[in-house]
Amino acid sequence: MDKKLYPRIGEEVIWETLDNGLPVCIVPKQGFSRKYALFATRYGGMDMRFRLNGQWLDTPAGIAHYLEHKLFENEDSDVFELYAATGADGNAMTGFEDTIYLFTCTENYAESLKILLDFVQDPYFTQENVDKEQGIIGQEIKMTMDLPNRKCFFNLLGALYAAHPVRNDIAGTVESIAQITPELLYRCYYAFYNLHNMALAVAGNLDVDEVIAICDEHLKPCEDMNLEVKFPEEPSLPVKPLVEEHFSVGVPIFSIGFKCAPYADDVIVKKEVEANILLSLLAGKMSPLYK
């Protein structure tokens, strides 16, 4: 168990890699009433082409988000009902690079953590429930098409990238999700929902040994997968310098993007901070442009 102290901010972070390969991050918060847990996998909206055990598979846009939705529906229960019984507030989110399942609570933390670990490891996909979800997510996609901020953001990505799947909406399109089948969901699940490709983070006034014991009891051992994700070749320059679209909004919305080569992991955080400072200076609430 690796403990790191941050005296300047009064924090302690505990790291432990379990025998099953899952890295666990624990942040003790003495005196806090609310507790948190996040169970995440490195699988997001742009991971559309991957190779597992030598076989390449191309998947439709939106399948990672679709899979996130379907995991909440088990064969004999609804996960939100299980959380309601413990008083926990559960949720999930799919990003470009990851999918995160989380809950917060003030009591019954151990029971809620068991629910989280169990349902994420228990996929249940049938043709009937997959077809039902297509209608639900299809309506969600149609609703987001009318959101100016979201539309502006993905117009920017479409102007920057010619082929990289980051240009696609994480939820996909009505047409792309119609291609999703139970078999395809299972293949994506067993490729990416592997404990060696996942992480657990917990925080709050909790018992560290109890958290580790629950993980050891409820996590299923698995072998590391020979998984490779591939992205298409991308030109260095943007596709278009400008994209305009008219919406009925009171205040114009704009986004600016800079296309650059990928940074190493240890540089990304620094570059993000630099970019946020620069953007605040250029277009923040105290900037001449905003005023």
What is each residue range found by the language model?
Residues 75-188, 209, 289-291:
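Acidic/histidine-enriched segments that form metal/cofactor-coordinating
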Residues 1-79, 186-290:
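His/Glu-rich zincin catalytic helix
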